[in-house]
Amino acid sequence: AYTCFGLACIVSPEIPNNAGSLAPFSVRAPEGSILNAVYPAAVCTRHIIGQMLPDTVFGCLAQAVPDRVPAEGAGCLWNVTFRGETDRGSNDTKIFCITAVTNGGTGARPSKDGLSATAYPSGVRGTPVEINESVAPIIFWRKEYSPDSGGVGKHRGGLGQVIEIESAIEADLE
């Protein structure tokens, strides 16, 4: 589906993404490969590989229709997972685990700039700092666009981020 999505974005972006619009495409991968895993292969994070496929397809299609293909961006989600214990040593010790969703920018598009701090192809934006800080003992000292990280050119890539996170308690984050 991710591969077909990449094809549809370039070949027919005006057509809705559904079973009917994807039916003309056929994609095959060798059995046993990372794209066609065979039981009992571990596939827990297969969505990460899947989210990288549209950029791979774009790289192939750029050879045939370079004026329709966006530049490669930061790719899919870049998540940072923290875990630890609160109030270590007290009777009220709790274990926490949080995944902070962070993103780079998308590549420049053929007729406009890329999107800043947005995962592609999902379009997922980052988790607000306030939500992360309310559910885990962490402090975001800084979360801002990285100036000029979109590169130069007629159309620039979306901006990435600079993020600084620290433990809010006297305990290490894992």
Predicted regions and their residues:
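Glycine/proline-enriched, intrinsically flexible loops and inter-domain linkers
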Residues: 1-174
